[in-house]
């Protein structure tokens, strides 16, 4: 296999040269671009994260230039604001902007993050015993994708701005998520509840990114409290995901079209962070590397593009979400080094 850094660079090159629209100055959803492209806000938050990954790995300023172009393009395409109907979409953007602040030191990013966060907090309501709503026009549907990322935001803002209210928000959101959407026996994270207004949990919806964001929330809380129980919980969630969702070789298979394309990359982002917290997670490092090897050896086509099935090259129309997920997985593996 080529060095992982070379594979990352090829995937990042394809991201920019195949999905960037020079006229609209924003990423498009598909390559080749379709005649009609809908606006999918949250994919752009992860595009920003992927560009930051490239900068962290290379220190090449063109990644920050691309980040700024995509940041401005996404803001413009969303109507001159980062506020949105879907709370979880705004949460992904907020996390990307907090990270941009950490990397660049530019206060405008965290100021924008706080502005969005203030709107996100309107998601909390008493339906289902509390928790953050998924979207503004369905306030009684509560799910992990709207809650765990919000807890991560709250804990990260607390660590940067030292506002006690942020810590309190994070604690109550995380508690709700663990109380309502975690299997207490296995630590597997369920997606959501009351989607159809019947109060039921969607036990059959099993997704990698739900595991990833709870790993992230528990890990951030462990950092704040120095409570190893939450770090251990993050490890249990990460390992249960491998047992429940990966194949016999430890490879996470295609999860579905459209939004599902992003899920694995999100999981691996937070699993990577977990591996940096303790030496207890060598097995999880190997899982990241295994999946990256499969992408590099089997999943990348001649254009450097990667589809949903990492075990084979994809041709025809490919979407941004699937490619981004692979880029993020490769970038996490690059941080672990070649082996």
Where do the PLM segments sit?
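Well-ordered alpha-helical scaffold segments within catalytic/enzyme domains
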Residues: 1, 45-60, 92-106, 149-163, ...
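Low-complexity, Ser/Thr/Pro/Gly-enriched N-terminal "stalk/linker" regions
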Residues: 1-73, 77-80, 103-131, 184, ...
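Alpha-helical scaffold segments in carbohydrate-active enzymes
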Residues: 10, 14, 53, 73, ...
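Carbohydrate-binding/catalytic loop surfaces
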Residues: 24-42, 89-100, 129-149, 186-207, ...
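Residue-level detector of extended alpha-helical repeat arrays and alpha-solenoid scaffolds
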Residues: 44, 64, 90-93, 110, ...
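Extended ligand-binding groove/face enriched in aromatic
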Residues: 64-160, 167-171
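Active-site cradle of extracellular carbohydrate-active enzymes
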Residues: 154-158, 166-218
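Non-catalytic carbohydrate-binding regions of carbohydrate-active enzymes
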Residues: 180, 184-188, 222-318
């Amino acid at each position: 296999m080529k060095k992982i850094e070379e594979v990352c660079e090829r995937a990042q090159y394809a991201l920019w040269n195949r999905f960037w629209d020079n006229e609209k100055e924003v990423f498009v959803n598909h390559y080749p671009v379709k005649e009609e492209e809908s606006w999918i806000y949250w994919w752009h938050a992860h595009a920003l994260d992927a560009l930051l990954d490239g900068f962290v790995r290379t220190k090449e300023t063109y990644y920050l230039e691309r980040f700024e172009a995509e940041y401005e393009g996404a803001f413009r395409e969303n109507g001159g604001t980062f506020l949105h109907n879907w709370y979880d979409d705004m949460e992904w953007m907020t996390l990307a902007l907090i990270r941009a602040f950490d990397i660049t030191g530019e206060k405008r990013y965290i100021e924008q993050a706080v502005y969005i966060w203030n709107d996100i907090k309107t998601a909390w309501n008493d339906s289902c015993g509390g928790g953050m709503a998924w979207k503004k026009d369905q306030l009684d549907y509560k799910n992990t994708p709207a809650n765990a990322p919000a807890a991560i935001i709250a804990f990260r803002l607390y660590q940067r701005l030292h506002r006690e209210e942020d810590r309190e928000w994070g604690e109550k959101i995380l508690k709700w998520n663990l109380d309502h959407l975690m299997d207490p026996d296995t630590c597997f994270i369920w997606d959501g509840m009351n989607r159809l207004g019947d109060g039921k949990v969607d036990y059959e919806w099993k997704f990698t990114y739900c595991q990833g964001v709870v790993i992230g929330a528990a890990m951030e809380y462990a950092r704040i409290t120095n409570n190893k129980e939450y770090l251990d919980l993050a490890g249990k969630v990460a390992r249960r995901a491998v047992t429940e969702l990966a194949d016999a070789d430890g490879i996470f298979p295609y999860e579905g079209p459209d939004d599902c394309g992003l899920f694995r990359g999100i999981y691996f982002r937070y699993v990577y962070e977990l591996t940096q917290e303790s030496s207890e997670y060598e097995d999880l490092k190997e899982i990241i590397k295994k999946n990256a090897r499969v992408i590099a050896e089997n999943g990348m086509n001649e254009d450097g593009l990667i589809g949903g099935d990492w075990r084979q090259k994809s041709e025809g129309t490919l979407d941004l979400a699937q490619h981004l997920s692979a880029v993020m997985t490769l970038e996490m593996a690059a941080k672990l080094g070649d082996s």
